[in-house]
């Protein structure tokens, strides 16, 4: 009898865990993703990357750069060299930074061109140089939630299999305060991904070629990286005292 009880407890526990992670994944895509497209040549690759990751998004066009419109999104993702090729973004980057200051989350999900980079494009100054790295260089991950949810990421996610020339390009050589390095390569100690708070929001500058790699290889580990880079933070705001309208809100409260 005792053995049966233990088995039932084990089954119930497993069911709860499976339900939690299923709910967590569902809640993550409840988040509204705004996407700023990059260069035209990579548009299909970018679209394929989101398709491979089963992530829904809305493209931000030139008429969308109004603070009330941007604040409807939980996260705004920036595509391949968008700060070089996307004219509406270059003309309205200050509005995007205001979105961050007011509680939004901005993340570059592919590399940005160093030669046309303005160090003031983001809420905090950041200089870019022209280092390029192939995959499997070896990386060090910081202790940060971006590697913990919705997937548990390890250095193996950033190892081999990203594709020829599709790992990292045009990143900073240092992370001046308030930037903090999230991913550092072992050989050069370059901060490949950096993060900072800005007002009520967060900004992540990433020089890994996530969209290009995922769009071309469909690699599961890169898909999990994209999920985490977009969804680790959760919703832009959660009114804990008000009505819990989303699964994510319920999870946050428990």
Question: Could you say what each language-model-derived stretch is?
Answer:
Residues 33-35, 59, 75-79, 105-109, ...:
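Structural recognition of the beta-strand scaffold that forms the well-ordered cores
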Residues 12-23:
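Bacterial N-terminal signal peptides
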Residues 5, 26-32, 37, 41-42, ...:
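Extracellular ligand-binding/catalytic regions of CAZymes and related secreted enzymes
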Residues 60-65, 90-94, 188-192:
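Alpha-helical scaffolding within the catalytic cores
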Residues 1-11:
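N-terminal secretory signal peptides that target proteins for export/translocation
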Residues 174-192:
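Short, Gly/Ser/Thr-enriched beta-strand-loop segments that form substrate-interacting elements
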Residues 46, 82-160, 178, 206, ...:
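A glycine-rich, often tryptophan-bearing local segment used as a flexible ligand/cofactor-contacting loop or short
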Residues 52-69:
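A short, well-structured beta->alpha microelement
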């Amino acid at each position: 009898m005792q053995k049966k009880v233990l088995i039932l407890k084990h089954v119930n526990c497993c069911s709860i865990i499976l339900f939690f992670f299923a709910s967590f994944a569902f809640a993550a895509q409840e988040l509204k993703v705004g996407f700023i497209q990059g260069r035209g040549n990579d548009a299909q690759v970018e679209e394929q990357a989101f398709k491979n990751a089963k992530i829904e998004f809305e493209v931000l066009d030139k008429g969308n750069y109004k603070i009330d419109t941007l604040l409807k999104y939980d996260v705004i993702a920036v595509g391949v060299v968008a700060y070089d090729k996307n004219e509406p973004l270059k003309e309205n980057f200050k509005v995007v930074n205001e979105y961050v200051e007011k509680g939004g989350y901005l993340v570059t999900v592919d590399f940005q061109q160093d030669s046309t980079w303005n160090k003031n494009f983001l809420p905090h100054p950041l200089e870019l140089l022209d280092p390029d790295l192939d995959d499997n260089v070896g990386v060090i991950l910081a202790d940060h939630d971006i590697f913990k949810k919705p997937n548990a990421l390890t250095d193996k996610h950033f190892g081999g299999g990203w594709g020829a020339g599709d790992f990292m390009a045009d990143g900073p050589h240092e992370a001046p305060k308030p930037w903090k390095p999230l991913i550092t390569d072992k050989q050069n100690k370059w901060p490949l991904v950096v993060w900072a708070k800005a007002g009520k929001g967060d900004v992540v500058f990433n020089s890994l070629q996530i969209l290009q790699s995922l769009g071309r290889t469909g690699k599961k580990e890169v898909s999990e990286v994209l999920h985490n880079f977009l969804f680790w933070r959760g919703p832009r705001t959660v009114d804990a005292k008000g009505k819990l309208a989303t699964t994510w809100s319920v999870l946050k409260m428990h």
